[in-house]
Amino acid sequence: MNPGYFITGTDTHVGKTWASIALMQYFKRQAKVVVGMKPVAAGCMLSDSYEGGGQYLCNEDALLMQTHASLHQSYDLINPYAYELPVSPHIAGVDDPVDFAKILECFDALKASADIVIVEGAGGWHAPLNAQQDIGDLAKALDLPVILVVGIKLGCINHAKLTYQAIQQSGLACAGWIAVCVAGDMLNKDENIQTLKAALSAPLLGVLPHTLTADFDLLAEQLVINQ
């Protein structure tokens, strides 16, 4: 069994977090112990409820992953790099740059207590994390199969084909892709999804419907993953 999956997307705001938590719920239904990880996040909020006392920066998506895990994990393991500025991590973290060694240490700690770790990347495949490395480099360092989240909107076919090509060039396996209907008024949505099915050789794992309120159990029902 795979120790986890790396979740990337065609862009930012394409539904990676909802897809990630839907995957967590899906595997929990398979009686797996599942935890989530968002190694790098920007635009974080200051919280007064740090587990060890005092204030800390936290990310809403990472908190959702913490809440929906099979067992409680320290926030520091789930989101080791939390930046306040809502900009690219390589800019937000100029004074505290992302170090892959720290992320790998946190991942190993999570993996030791779970069957599956769902790791959500920031932004798209080539989003920079520090001066030299990007999301694709992190996926390679973790050596996890990749699941591509495609936000179904105008331009998604081009974005999906380019991202899928980059994943293939990295040498990592693409376990499949998830369509997320981010635009409620998308014209010819089904035709776009069929075009993507023909263009991407990886399997379609599910289509998540457009919704303003997340029902992660319902979203999990839309997924089928063959491990």
Residue ranges and their predicted role:
Residues F6-S20:
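Glycine-rich phosphate-binding P-loop
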Residues H13, A122-A202, G206:
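Conserved catalytic-core segment of NTP-binding enzymes
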